[in-house]
Curated annotation (Swiss-Prot):
Taxonomy of the source species: Bacteria, Pseudomonadati, Pseudomonadota, Alphaproteobacteria, Rickettsiales
Subunit structure: Heptamer of 7 subunits arranged in a ring. Interacts with the chaperonin GroEL.
The keyword Cytoplasm belongs to this UniProt entry's keyword annotation: yes
InterPro entries: Chaperonin_GroES (IPR020818), Chaperonin_GroES_sf (IPR037124), Chaprnonin_Cpn10_CS (IPR018369), GroES-like_sf (IPR011032)
PANTHER family noted in UniProt: 10 KDA HEAT SHOCK PROTEIN (PTHR10772), 20 KDA CHAPERONIN, CHLOROPLASTIC (PTHR10772:SF63)
NCBIfam families from the UniProt entry: PRK00364.1-2, PRK00364.1-5, PRK00364.2-2, PRK00364.2-4
Organism: Rickettsia canadensis (strain McKiel)
Protein name per the record: Co-chaperonin GroES
């Protein structure tokens, strides 16, 4: 089974980062307030205007992006965790 987002939605595979304090305590992503990172795995076709014309998304599969910690909806496809969100929930592309 594969997943294809609709319209202006994208699917992101989160990049998990664990950091340690100087004392060796691991701080999981769930305890951090900074933006999250991920790789786009699928994109929708784009948005439609009032005339029915489709505007394609600016983001593309393979882009590494920053997004807000609470953005989107978490799903699981074939055991892989994905976040589905609208394109405008993405903060930016990491080069």
């Amino acid at each position: 089974m594969s997943f294809k987002p609709l319209h202006d939605r994208i699917a992101i595979k989160p990049i998990e980062h664990e950091e340690k304090t100087k004392g060796g305590i691991i701080i999981p992503d769930t305890a951090k307030e900074k933006p999250m990172q991920g790789i786009i795995t699928a994109v929708g076709t784009g948005t439609r205007n009032e005339k029915g014309e489709v505007y394609p998304l600016e983001l593309k599969v393979g882009d590494k992006v920053l997004y807000g910690k609470w953005a989107g909806t978490e799903i699981e496809i074939k055991g892989e965790k994905l976040i589905v969100m609208k394109e405008n929930d993405v903060l930016g592309i990491i080069n």
